[in-house]
Amino acid sequence: MIMKHFLHLIVLLSFFAASACNPVEPQIDSISLSSKETVIDYQQQTMSITVTSSGGWTLTGSYDWAVHSVKAGKSGDSVLISVTENTSGSERKAVFTFRCGDAVATYSLTQQKGPDKPVQPEEPEKPEDPDRPLDPDRLSGTVIGSKYSVDYDNGNSKSTTANTKDNVFDGRYDTFFASYDRSRTWVGLDLGQKHIITKVGWSPRVGQQQRVELALFEGANEPDFSDAIPIWIVREPGVNRTMHYADITCSRGFRYVRYVSPNDVRCNLAELEFYGHPGEGDDSQLYQLTNLPTVVVNIADGEEVVEKEKNLISNVYIISEDGTNLLATGGTEIRGRGNASWDFPKKPYRLKFDEKQSPLGAPASAKKWTLLSNYGDKPLMRNMLAFEVSRRVGLGYTPFCHPVDLIINGEYRGCYQLCDQVEAAKGRVDAKDGYLVEIDAYAYSEDVWFSSNRGTPVTIKHPDEDEITQEQRKFINDYFNQMEAAVFASDYTDPAEGYRKHLDLDSFLKNFIVGEFGGNTDTYWSVYMYKDAADGKLYTGPVWDYDLAFENDYRTYPINNLWDYIYASNGSVASEAVRQMVTRIVKEDPQAKERLIELWETACNEGGLKNLNAVVDQNAELLKEAQELNFKRWKILNQHVHMNFQALGSYDKEVQTVKKYIDGRLEKFDELVRR
C-alpha cells in the first residue's frame, strides 16, 4: 500500500515537472506603423499613420504645431497628424510614441523650415503703379474687418495699433494687415450704399506671396455678412509689390464687400481695392467658383461646425447654371455627419432646410441633404461611380448626387458631393409606410437599434427615432430574426418556404454586384434594407459609402488578385452571421447562383457596365477645374490618407488607377460569378 502511494506521488511530481518545462506561451505584444519617419516641407498639411497591433494601443507626444487626432485605438485605425505652417525660421521635429502592452513603436516627423524672409529696404510713399489704373470707379468707405491684428515685433501679441486692417488701403506695399487669429479673418469696406462691383484688386504682403491663394472676395447687404455670396476666388499665389486685378461679373448690388483670408494665414495682405458704381442690381448673373454649382453656407454668428449632434442655423445659397440660377434659403440647419469620415480634416455635413427643396434638379423634394467630403477619394468620384453602377444594375432606388464647390463662412472648403439623405420618403427609399433599417457595425452608437439573434447589429432608420413605437421596434426586430433564421434553416433554398419568402433575392444580388464589382471593402459593414408594405419582404439597398471602393483600400489591394470575392477574403462585415448569410445565398443556393449570372450579364450587355470607363472620363472632365482648387486647399496628392495604398502626386494618375481597376474587374468578376 505504501509503495502504491509512493508511485502515485512520483507520477504527480513528474507531471508538475513536465508542466514547468512546457509553460503556456503568453501572447506577444506587437505594434507597427505604416510609416516610421516622414520629412515634409514647411507648408500646412495633414499626415495619416495606420497602426497594426495585437490589441488596443495608446499614443503619446504633444506638440502645438503637430496635433494628433486620437490618443488611443485598435489595430487598423489611422491617426491624423495636423501640421501647421513652419514660420519659426528653423527645422522642427516631433516624435510620437505608440504602445501596445510592452510593444513600442515610434513615428518621427521632421518639418523643414520655411523660406527666409527677404530683407527689404524701407520703401518711401509708393507712387502709382503704371499697371494700377487711376480709375474714378475705385471705391472708398469705412474700413471693416477682424478686430485684432498681430504685433510680430512684440512676441506675436494681440494688437489694435500694429499691422492693422487700415494698412491695406494706405497705398503702400511695405505695410500690411496681419490678423491675430490665424483663420476666419477678413478685411473690407462698408460702402454706405449698394454698389455693383466691377473689379477687385489685391497685393500680398511682401515675402508672403503664397498666402493669398484661395482667398475669397464676397459681397453682402447685412453687416454680419449672413447673406454674403462670392464674387471672386484667388487661384494663384501673388507677386511681390504688384497689384493683381480681376474683372467681376456679378449683377447683384452690395453695400458691404470683403476679402476673406485663406485658412491659417492671418490675412497677410498688403493692398486691397474695390471698383464699381452705385446700383441695386439683380440676381440675373452671379458668380460660380468653377463650372460646378457653388454651395454657400453662412452660419449664424460665424460659428464653426465642430460636432455631429448640434445643429447650427445658417443661410444657404446654391448658385448654378453658370450663375443664372439661385436657390436661397434661410433657417437651414447644418451639423456634422459620418463615422470615420468625421475625423478627417475635410469634414462631411448634413443640411436640413426649413422647407422641402429639390436642389440642382434632384428627383426628391426633401428637407434633408448631405454634403460628402470624399477626402480619401482623390479622384473625387468613387461614390458617383457606385451610384452609376447601381443604376446600370437596376436597383430600385439610387441616391441622387452632384459635385459642388463648398464655401462655409466665407472660406473655401473644397469639392464636395451634394447627395440625398438616405431616408424613407417620396423620391427616395420607397418605404414610407414600412421600415428602413441598416445592418450597421456602428449601430451601438445609435439611439434606436437592436442585435439580432445571431449577433448582427441593426439600426432602425424609419420610422424616425422620435416617432417609432415599442410595437414597431419589436415587429421589425422579430421580422429580421425570421429572415435571418430562414437563411440558416436546412430547407432555406425552398422557393416557397425558404428565405426568399422574407428576403427579395433580386435586390440582394444586385446590391452584391455593385459592392463586389465596385470593390467595396465595406459592402457588408453597412447594408441598407427596407421592408416594402406591399409584399412584406426585405429589399436590399440603396448602395452608400463607396469611398474605399474601386481600388482605394490597402487592406484588399490588389483586389483582382484575390482568389475569392472581397467579402469572403478581406472584406469588413458587421457580423460573422452576415458573411455566412452572403455565402449561403451567393455560393450555396443553386438558383441564386444562376440568377446572379443572369443579372450580371444583363448589367454588362444591356446596362452598359462594359462602358463604365467612359463615365470615368466624363466625370474627370467635369471635375477638372474643381479638383485643381480642391487639392490646393487639401494638399494630399502626395500623402497616404485614410486607407490609401498609394500616393501618386497627380489627379490624372489617380483617375487612371480607377480605370485600370475597372478593366481588370470586368474580367475577374465574370470569372468569379461563373466559378
Features from the language model and the residues they span:
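Bacterial Sec-dependent N-terminal signal peptides
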Residues: 16-39, 100, 106, 110-137
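Surface-exposed binding patches on compact interaction domains or structured appendages
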Residues: 30-33, 52-80
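A short beta-strand micro-motif common to beta-rich folds, especially ectodomain repeats
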Residues: 90-102
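Disordered, acidic Ser/Thr/Pro-rich linker "stalks" and the adjacent N-terminal cap
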Residues: 120-192, 205-211, 278-281
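Trp- and acidic/polar-enriched beta-sheet ligand-binding modules for extracellular glycan
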Residues: 146, 153, 181-184, 208-279
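A short beta-strand element within beta-rich, extracytoplasmic domains
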Residues: 195-207, 259
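Internal "kinase-insert"/substrate-recognition segments embedded within catalytic cores
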Residues: 297, 352, 357-358, 373, ...
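Middle-to-C-terminal accessory/interaction subdomains
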Residues: 303-305, 329-331, 338-340, 344, ...
